[in-house]
């Protein structure tokens, strides 16, 4: 008999009879048919689906060597609405210029790098001005905004760079920024800033740039304003639409006390083996990008989700530990492109474990949630609405007060919803709620419920509960439920 450890045959029979009785007393809003699928062919289909989605989200991360030669260093005025001002134009009204005005006694200036690469020690010697860059603790304290030109690079190697909050400091990258075994953090000091909001230094990397953070630490950067939340990538309206995406490589690093640790727009990014702690908004926020997020730990997101995927995004989110998100551990909303969420361990979310909203996956760009462990969320483990297709394969869901899986579409969608090989149970309500999905395929799942006290299947599947349990549990079949 297929796995169904917590249900005796007597209890199962009671559920079957209950399902039959309920079906007999309800008027079915739609006609539903149940077909048994050939087991071997179905397993081949699942294997092909896994291979297809893995291929769709896999990419070769673009790496870039730092620019050759020694960069030139200059101080340039920050005139808004002028030629060449677009890299800092978005920050005219966000507090940066007010913070600068409280420190610089003249028209705001930015340190500009051109035509090569430079280390912090070399930059210190070239500037020779402690008001701009001075030795501090185990590295240097920067008190001016710094702009890395498209042909330039800033190298942090085994050092620390402190960014002054009081003076209005930011790193604006059009070229190449690299941290290796280094520390980048804000320094507030004991002086109040000249701003009307909680302002902190940030890093912005524009389309065409490359940023890499390896074995390094970023701390206390960003505040909740556009393009200023931490380490952010974006494309400016002043850049050609054909500009190549910003590239980001983050490995074996730590991010803590950020507004949003990493906010990616129009990017290609690899984030591996890193820790994200005490983020205010999101740990990783992705839009219109290609991203691989693997083997990371995300702990303590105050207000929103751990990982958010939106827009034209292809994403692999795999083998991550995500604990204590303010909303969902992983949120996918209004997104197009293949997504694979695999092998993640998710718990203690103050919303849903995984939240899916307004998605229309296709056979070429599927949405697959595979082999994840989800538990102890305040809402449902997986909560989906207005989702056109979804595959849930081999997941273990337990200890949630709502539903193990809830999918609701106001307007019926074609599907399919695939549920195969999942272990689902110890939930407060029904294990599976499905509304508005024209095709549902079930098989090989095990259920840990409360016999006689709760339904396993509700929504559109409630009238068929007895039939489906008989076929999939007692007989071990995989079935397709079709609505007409």
Q: Where are the model-predicted features located?
A:
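Bacterial N-terminal signal peptides that target proteins for export
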Residues: 1-9
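Bacterial N-terminal signal peptides
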Residues: 8-18
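Beta-strand/loop edge motif enriched in small/polar residues
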Residues: 23-384, 392, 401-407, 414-419, ...
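Acidic, aromatic-lined catalytic clefts of primarily extracellular/periplasmic carbohydrate-active enzymes
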Residues: 388
């Amino acid at each position: 008999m297929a796995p169904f450890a917590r249900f005796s045959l007597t209890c199962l029979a009671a559920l079957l009879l209950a399902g039959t009785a309920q079906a007999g007393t309800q008027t079915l809003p739609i006609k539903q048919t149940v077909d048994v699928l050939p087991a071997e062919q179905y397993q081949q289909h699942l294997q092909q689906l896994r291979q297809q989605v893995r291929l769709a989200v896999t990419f070769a991360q673009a790496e870039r060597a730092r620019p050759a030669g020694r960069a030139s260093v200059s101080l340039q005025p920050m005139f808004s609405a002028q030629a060449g001002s677009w890299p800092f134009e978005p920050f005219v009204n966000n507090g940066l210029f007010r913070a600068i005005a409280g420190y610089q006694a003249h028209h705001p200036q930015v340190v500009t790098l051109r035509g090569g690469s430079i280390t912090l020690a070399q930059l210190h010697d070239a500037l020779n001005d402690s008001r701009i860059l001075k030795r501090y603790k185990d590295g240097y304290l920067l008190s001016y905004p710094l702009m890395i030109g498209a042909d330039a690079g800033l190298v942090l190697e085994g050092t620390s760079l402190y960014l002054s909050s009081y003076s209005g400091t930011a790193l604006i990258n059009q070229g190449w920024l690299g941290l290796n075994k280094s520390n980048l953090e804000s320094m507030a000091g004991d002086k109040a800033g000249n701003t009307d909001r909680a302002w902190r230094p940030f890093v912005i990397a524009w389309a065409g740039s490359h940023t890499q953070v390896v074995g390094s630490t970023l701390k206390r950067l960003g505040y909740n304003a556009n393009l200023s939340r931490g380490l952010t990538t974006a494309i400016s309206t002043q850049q050609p639409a054909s500009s190549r995406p910003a590239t980001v490589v983050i490995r074996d690093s730590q991010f803590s006390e950020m507004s949003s640790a990493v906010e990616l727009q129009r990017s290609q990014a690899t984030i591996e083996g890193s820790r994200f702690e005490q983020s205010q908004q999101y740990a990783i926020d992705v839009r219109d990008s290609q991203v691989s997020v693997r083997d990371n730990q995300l702990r303590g997101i105050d207000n929103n989700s751990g990982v958010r995927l939106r827009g034209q995004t292809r994403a692999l989110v795999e083998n991550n530990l995500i604990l204590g998100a303010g909303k969902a551990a992983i949120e996918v909303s209004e997104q197009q492109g293949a997504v694979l969420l695999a092998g993640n361990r998710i718990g203690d979310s103050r919303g849903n474990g995984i939240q899916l909203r307004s998605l229309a996956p296709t056979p070429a760009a599927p949405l697959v949630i595979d082999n994840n462990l989800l538990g102890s969320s305040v809402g449902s483990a997986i909560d989906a609405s207005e989702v056109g297709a979804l595959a849930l394969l081999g997941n273990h869901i337990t200890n949630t007060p709502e539903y193990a899986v809830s999918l609701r579409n106001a307007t019926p969608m074609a599907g399919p919803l695939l549920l195969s090989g999942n272990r689902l149970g110890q939930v407060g309500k029904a294990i599976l709620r499905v509304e508005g999905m024209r095709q549902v395929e079930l098989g090989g799942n095990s259920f840990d419920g409360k016999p006689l006290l709760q339904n396993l299947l509700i929504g559109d599947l409630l009238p068929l509960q007895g039939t489906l349990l008989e076929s999939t549990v007692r007989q071990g079949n995989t079935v397709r439920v079709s609505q007409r």
